[in-house]
UniProtKB/Swiss-Prot annotation:
Domain notes per entry: The N-terminal domain interacts with the head of the 30S subunit; the C-terminal domain interacts with the body and contacts protein S4. The interaction surface between S4 and S5 is involved in control of translational fidelity.
UniProt xrefs under PROSITE patterns: RIBOSOMAL_S5, S5_DSRBD
Region Disordered: start-end pairs: 1-54
UniProtKB keywords: Ribonucleoprotein, Ribosomal protein, RNA-binding, rRNA-binding
Stored Pfam families: Ribosomal_S5, Ribosomal_S5_C
Keyword rRNA-binding listed: yes
GO biological process: translation
InterPro entries: Ribosomal_Su5_D2-typ_SF, Ribosomal_uS5, Ribosomal_uS5_bac-type, Ribosomal_uS5_C, Ribosomal_uS5_N, Ribosomal_uS5_N_CS, Ribsml_uS5_D2-typ_fold_subgr
Protein name: Small ribosomal subunit protein uS5
A GO-annotated cellular component: small ribosomal subunit
Gene (name only): rpsE
Length: 233
């Protein structure tokens, strides 16, 4: 009888906990596992945002592509979303990131955070175009980049336009062949941008003056040196 009484008390306590929406065991797992982990991940994101605000850094964020994905598990399929985001400061720095999550906003947030961590600096001529032509390849994708005179605008489409707008380029001519996959186009474009070198960097690597690279003399040489000094690496 004593055992039956104890069992009955235990069952009554469990029913009361369920009615009140409390469960000591589940509550401990929430604090020690998912709860604390969730706060940690969200907390890091919020701290990163605060650091950007404190530094006065304003970033341009562009959603390039989003698609639905699925993962086959033992119980069936789990559906989610994948986002591709490009981030830049409009002053020569740009990055891209990819994120997956069950919900669209969370996928975009993950992609944005990843893009901020992979930003690269691209030297720009006069702060508006590339220093020289370039080419990049990734997978089946091949992209061509050409510097352009003032007033040309951004001749690019889709993912490539988002990159140059975020980068701060005002005049450029591009062409993409071989693929329409936005991921391949983005990676091929970044490969081409990574190969961009300013006259200042080339002169330092070769141990020459800027004017020597262009074969200039007199006032033209002084102008070339001044233009090179104004380039932000």
């Amino acid at each position: 009888m004593a055992n039956e009484s104890e069992i009955q008390k235990t069952e009554n306590a469990e029913v009361a906990n369920a009615a009140n929406g409390t469960n000591p065991n589940n509550e401990r797992r929430g604090r020690g596992g998912r709860g604390r982990g969730g706060r940690g991940r969200d907390g890091r994101g919020r701290r990163d945002d605060r650091r950007n605000e404190e530094a006065g850094e304003e970033l341009i964020e562009k959603l390039v592509h989003i698609n639905r994905v699925s993962k086959t598990v033992k119980g069936g399929k789990r559906f989610g979303f994948a986002a591709l985001v490009v981030v830049g400061d409009g002053k020569g720095r740009v990055g891209f990131g990819h994120g997956k999550a069950r919900e669209v906003p969370e996928a975009i947030s993950k992609a944005t955070a990843a893009a901020k961590k992979t930003m690269i600096r691209v030297p720009l001529r006069e702060g508006r175009t590339l220093h020289h032509d370039g080419r990049g390849r990734f997978g089946a994708g091949l992209v061509y980049l050409r510097s352009a005179p003032s007033g040309t605008g951004i001749i690019a489409g889709g993912p490539m336009r988002a990159i140059f707008e975020s980068l701060g380029v005002a005049d450029v001519v591009t062409k993409s062949v071989g693929t329409s996959n936005p991921y391949n186009m983005i990676r091929a474009t970044f490969e081409a941008l990574n190969d961009q070198k300013s006259p200042k960097a080339v002169a330092q690597r070769r141990g020459k003056r800027i004017a020597d690279l262009f074969g200039r003399g007199g006032a033209s040489a002084a102008k070339a040196e001044a233009e090179a000094a104004a380039v932000v690496e």
